[in-house]
């Protein structure tokens, strides 16, 4: 999920917002699912295997609360730039976007959901995230 609707449209299209060799194939199968497929092993066509159909299980959306409420695992990955003003400007990490995202997760996550923080953050940030999550789940 992302708050940027244009980015989500790209993830839901054939033209992903990032280029990584082979990524479109992986995303397409997970996002769109597949039909059952019969493949032949070896060169002599003697051994055939049927790969079962696959339901879609990768979704891109701007609806944060709905997505988080349905998720068993939530990966939080937001931009964490260097602060540009105030105490620590030019050196400290700006955690405003991270704290906002974690607050949204805390308000919507179901009990027992696993929250994984994937942004580049300073030591001790996990403690802050835990506090936000515990306050939001009350």
What is the role of each PLM region?
Residues 3-73, 77-92, 135-136:
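Conserved N-terminal Rossmann-fold NAD(P) cofactor-binding segment
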